[in-house]
């Protein structure tokens, strides 16, 4: 896929606001490739009440939403701007969120709800003992009309196995409702389409959101482990690195073990598109120098659908004299 700059749309409630109420404003960042984009509010000056949802990949392009909750008095007295940066396309967009003019027909007095659908976690999809779930989230539900009904479809056939949680009250006095659909691993890997349909008395019409696995032939990664650089051995903490390259789609899970025990002190870079259209990432495990020098075995473990049995791992340990 080619590098594509995002389109940025402001999201504002279409209702008259009470002076003492909280208001949630949003920014829709649509149709970009590759990851990542960064979203800040008022160039970082607004940081509390910010929620940026994970990006969703559909038809080869990513879409992401970020929201910020502020007192309505703040919104009416000062500008609220979302700042979007997409390094891959050298794009920077500042979008001011302005109150929508209320026409007499359009103002019902109810909040404007938004619906988001999220893919299952990669680890859940590729581990037979875990249960992958597609998740549908509705935000900004008015307490005046809190009933929300979820319907789920797999390839347009309705299913009734979803687990819908009780609505949760948010800091801006609206409600948030979540429905999770447990799915069969193979259905996701085979590219079936999962659709969430949300209905409410407050909606003029049902809202539908769909998601499926990115199209294209899976390619398994090559995995390489690298010992701490010699120059780093003067420090008390050293880095063990795992390079994972040549994989598609970008959905992958990488973790570390020491002597077979899971470790937590590691960080992964996001999957990044390489020049050939495949993806690569680096994973860095931090350990004490003595832990490395004692000859413990460190293993980089990778889950990806293009691998045999969806799994591979590479180990290394310190050898005296190296």
Swiss-Prot record:
Concerning PANTHER family, the annotation shows:
TAPASIN (PTHR23411)
Disulfide bond sites? 27-82, 136-196, 242-300
**SMART domains per record:** IGc1
Q: What does the record give under GO molecular function?
A: antigen binding; immunoglobulin receptor binding
Question: Which GO annotations describe the biological process of this protein?
Answer: antibacterial humoral response; complement activation, classical pathway
Q: Which UniProt keywords apply?
A: Disulfide bond, Glycoprotein, Immunoglobulin domain, Repeat
List each copy of the Ig-like domain by range.
6-98, 115-212, 221-317
Q: Which protein is depicted?
A: Ig gamma-2A chain C region
Q: Which positions are glycosylated?
A: 172
Transmembrane portions of the chain: none
Q: Which organism is it from?
A: Rattus norvegicus
Name the PROSITE patterns on file: IG_LIKE
Taken from the UniProt entry, a GO cellular component term is:
immunoglobulin complex, circulating
| Record-linked Pfam families | C1-set
**Which InterPro entries does the UniProt entry name for this protein?**
Ig-like_dom, Ig-like_dom_sf, Ig-like_fold, Ig_C1-set, Immune_Resp_Modulators
Q: Which SUPFAM superfamilies match?
A: Immunoglobulin (SSF48726)
